Amino acid sequence: MASQGTKRSYEQMETGGERQNTTEIRASVGRMIGGIGRFYIQMCTELKLSDYEGRLIQNSITIERMVLSAFDERRNKYLEEHPSAGKDPKKTGGPIYRRIDGKWIRELILYDKEEISRIWRQANNGEDATAGLTHMMIWHSNLNDATYQRTRALVRTGMDPRMCSLMQGSTLPRRSGAAGAAVKGVGTMVMELIRMIKRGINDRNFWRGENGRRTRIAYERMCNILKGKFQTAAQKAMMDQVRESRNPGNAEIEDLIFLARSALILRGSVAHKSCLPACVYGLAVASGHDFEREGYSLVGIDPFRLLQNSQVFSLIRPNENPAHKSQLVWMACHSAAFEDLRVSSFIRGKRVVPRGQLSTRGVQIASNENMETMDSSTLELRSRYWAIRTRSGGNTNQQRASAGQISVQPTFSVQRNLPFERATIMAAFTGNTEGRTSDMRTEIIRIMESARPEDVSFQGRGVFELSDEKATSPIVPSFDMSNEGSYFFGDNAEEYDN
């Protein structure tokens, strides 16, 4: 599935299209974005939200979650077959925040899923528009990536918390399709596979019978997706071994963890897309922007341009720093949770600080939080420059290792050196090179040892002025090469608990 011959651009994955030319891709992505915008406007009308309330990111998230829940076929079916107390399987809802007499009031709303899906289809020319749904899932996933740490999840599967930069997309639902698979990090795929193998170890029937056959197909497909993310022959060969294993068990788990570690230096190809909150698209559509006619790209200037002239608000808790809240959302909008802070800061034109130094909690407000003390402020989502999003891990000239960047997975295609402590990483590889994958392991370790930290990734690539929409004159930034900029150092973020 993810073999070399079938590489499609993100936009094709995003819109389910086969090979199209750039104009067609831009138009179909534009159609998807326009549909989200029209849906959002309609929902604001239904809920009688004022202009200000419609620009509140928390309201946007509730509306996005409602439509995602309305179209979650498997969960809806499950809810109908296993009725739980106090949950109506046919309804969906969430908190809507309204500004009344200078105070923010939380109102819990409930809608028929039928009704929501009708409004969604109507906004999307009567189609299901799965691409638009996936797009919103990726925005939520990017927001989670920027907000929470996954240390516990990593440790539970036997991985190391230092592998956090490989965990992009770890909260994406399984149903997110090809576009979702493209944005998942190596660690996310490894974690999904390990969970599957562990179930097989504990449950004799997991791989058996008709269900087991389907499980097996899913397993092999996930292996192929992961294989497609690796860029060296040895890593790919090792994935073939894992995929072809008759009865996946601890040996495969070992191999997968080895591969995940190796991805700290031999980075995988992980796609990055700027997915914005629905209210941003709604604002643009409301102001008369025709996305389908103008065309749109998730990896170019368009999202930057959109954020330059959109005003979005957020609720702020009493001791949160609005500038920090803005940084969090900016990172989520550009899928930059795992990007080098030096690069992000340069593009944003403001210093981007590591998560451990942020005085802000997540964007969503829990139902037990006190609304009396809530304030709201404008999110500063503008940038100084724009840059093209990348789908490569930033290894210099493929097939040869370069010092990929530990604890960073590049988002922007911008030249930088990749400072990393090879000793720290290589220490993780002492010991086990026996077994049937020994020659591949030896080869992978050899490639990593020859990696040079002084290599430059994305040679000659730069950022662009916001007036330079055709990306004609790149500005290649020079970074202070000594310090590495991982967002996760000194981390004290909350865990993501589903």
Curated annotation (Swiss-Prot):
Disulfide bonds: none annotated. Late in virus-infected cells, may be cleaved from a 56-kDa protein to a 53-kDa protein by a cellular caspase. This cleavage might be a marker for the onset of apoptosis in infected cells or have a specific function in virus host interaction. InterPro entries: Flu_NP (IPR002141). Its main location: virion. Keywords: Capsid protein, Helical capsid protein, Host nucleus, Host-virus interaction, Ribonucleoprotein, RNA-binding, Viral nucleoprotein, Viral penetration into host nucleus, Virion, Virus entry into host cell. A motif (Unconventional nuclear localization signal) lies at residues 1-18. Residues 1-23 are annotated as: Disordered. One of its GO terms (cellular component) is host cell nucleus. Pfam families: Flu_NP. Belongs to the influenza viruses nucleoprotein family. HAMAP family: INFV_NCAP. This is Nucleoprotein. The gene is NP.
